[in-house]
């Protein structure tokens, strides 16, 4: 579960390393974001020469959470870190590579470009 002030690792090659959540994009008074949800965040740590800079406000989709997700068959999938991928207005990733695994739930949310770039889909 990601909420305001949560920090996430960035799982792409845009140059950002860490994002802090400012707002969860969604319906009404939604407080928490899970895998596949879009957040607005500010870049807290970035590498020099990247596409994005420190302090820039960006949108990102969550691809991994520590809390995990319950699947319809009753199994859970959880990760060691909270991670996201920076996206543009058309919900396409701004980077050209994705690092680490992503979940199948992104397919249901129509993030096919992220699924195709990911090295592993769990």
UniProtKB/Swiss-Prot annotation:
Disulfide bridge partners, by residue number: none
UniProt keyword rRNA-binding, yes or no: yes
Protein's UniProt keywords contain Ribosomal protein: yes
Any single GO BP term: translation
CDD domains to which the protein is assigned, alphabetical: Ribosomal_uL14
Keyword field: Ribonucleoprotein, Ribosomal protein, RNA-binding, rRNA-binding
Parts forming coiled coils: none
A GO CC term attached to the entry: cytosolic large ribosomal subunit
Molecular function GO labels: large ribosomal subunit rRNA binding; structural constituent of ribosome
InterPro entries: Ribosomal_uL14, Ribosomal_uL14_bac-type, Ribosomal_uL14_CS, Ribosomal_uL14_sf
Source organism, top-level taxon: Bacteria
Family as reported in the entry's similarity comment: Belongs to the universal ribosomal protein uL14 family.
Role this protein plays: Binds to 23S rRNA. Forms part of two intersubunit bridges in the 70S ribosome.
Quaternary structure (record): Part of the 50S ribosomal subunit. Forms a cluster with proteins L3 and L19. In the 70S ribosome, L14 and L19 interact and together make contacts with the 16S rRNA in bridges B5 and B8.
NCBIfam families per UniProt: rplN_bact (TIGR01067)
Protein name (record): Large ribosomal subunit protein uL14
Organism in which the protein naturally occurs: Natranaerobius thermophilus (strain ATCC BAA-1301 / DSM 18059 / JW/NM-WN-LF)
The gene coding this protein: rplN
């Amino acid at each position: 579960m990601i909420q305001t002030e949560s920090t996430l690792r960035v799982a792409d090659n845009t140059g950002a390393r860490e994002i802090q959540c400012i707002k969860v994009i969604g319906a009404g008074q939604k407080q928490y974001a899970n895998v596949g949800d879009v957040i607005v965040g500010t870049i807290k740590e970035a590498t020099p020469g990247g596409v994005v800079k420190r302090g820039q406000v960006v949108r990102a989709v969550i691809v991994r959470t520590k809390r995990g997700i319950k699947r319809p068959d009753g199994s859970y999938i959880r990760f060691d870190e909270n991670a996201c991928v920076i996206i543009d207005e058309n919900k396409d990733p701004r980077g050209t590579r994705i690092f680490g695994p992503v979940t199948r739930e992104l397919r249901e949310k129509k993030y096919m470009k992220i699924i195709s770039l990911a090295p592993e889909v769990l």
